[in-house]
């Protein structure tokens, strides 16, 4: 149990470091077991409206960065996620939008299956 708690705390610290340092620090992580994910996303500059967000999960993310950013790619590797595309917008520390308000970055993402930690294939969302 302590090991699981230790991993959770380490992962939370890594996410905080990625969000605080978009350029990354050049550290490479490798995770055990991989999951290949195919993400089809709109162009990162395309803004969608709430009615155009067909995934059903509109998120408010603390940060949205490109999957090729060093810190983001390290986090994906640590989680065992291998994206089949490059330059996929990744939302970090994302929560569901409640009451139509978001104080950070409102996005519509194609893959929200990783809890509140990350969302994949994110496009800016106009509230």
UniProtKB/Swiss-Prot annotation:
Q: List the disulfide bonds.
A: 53-108, 60-102, 61-94, 109-122
Where does it localize? Secreted; Secreted, Cell wall
Q: Name one GO cellular component term.
A: fungal-type cell wall
Is Transmembrane there in the keyword field? no
Q: Could you confirm whether the keyword Aminoacyl-tRNA synthetase appears in this record? A: no
Provide the glycosylation site positions: 66
Per UniProt, subunit arrangement is:
Self-assembles to form functional amyloid fibrils called rodlets. Self-assembly into fibrillar rodlets occurs spontaneously at hydrophobic:hydrophilic interfaces and the rodlets further associate laterally to form amphipathic monolayers.
Cited function = Aerial growth, conidiation, and dispersal of filamentous fungi in the environment rely upon a capability of their secreting small amphipathic proteins called hydrophobins (HPBs) with low sequence identity. Class I can self-assemble into an outermost layer of rodlet bundles on aerial cell surfaces, conferring cellular hydrophobicity that supports fungal growth, development and dispersal; whereas Class II form highly ordered films at water-air interfaces through intermolecular interactions but contribute nothing to the rodlet structure.
Q: What is this protein called?
A: Class I hydrophobin 1
Organism (species): Lentinula edodes
């Amino acid at each position: 149990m302590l090991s699981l708690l230790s991993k959770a705390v380490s992962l939370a610290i890594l996410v905080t470091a990625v969000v605080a340092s978009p350029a990354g620090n050049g550290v490479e992580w490798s995770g055990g077991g991989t999951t290949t994910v195919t993400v089809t996303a709109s162009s990162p500059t395309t803004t969608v409206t709430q009615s155009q967000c067909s995934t059903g999960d509109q998120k408010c993310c603390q940060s949205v960065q490109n999957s090729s950013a060093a810190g983001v790619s390290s986090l994906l590797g640590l989680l065992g996620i291998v994206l089949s595309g490059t330059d996929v917008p990744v939302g970090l520390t994302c929560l569901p939008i409640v009451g139509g308000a978001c104080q950070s970055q409102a996005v519509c993402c194609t893959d929200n299956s990783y809890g509140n930690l990350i969302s994949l294939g994110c496009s800016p969302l106009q509230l």
